Amino acid sequence: VPPKGVSM
């Protein structure tokens, strides 16, 4: 799960 604010 990517960090909040990162679109992946």
Swiss-Prot record:
Molecular-function GO terms, alphabetical: toxin activity
Chief place where the protein resides: secreted
GO cellular component assignments: extracellular region
One BP annotation, GO: defense response
UniProt KW keywords: Amphibian defense peptide, Bradykinin receptor impairing toxin, G-protein coupled receptor impairing toxin, Secreted, Toxin, Vasoactive, Vasodilator
Subcellular location as annotated: Secreted
Protein family per UniProt: Belongs to the bradykinin-related peptide family.
Role description: Vasodilator. May target bradykinin receptors (BDKRB).
Protein name per its UniProtKB record: Bradykinin-related peptide Pnor-7
Lineage: Eukaryota, Metazoa, Chordata, Craniata, Vertebrata
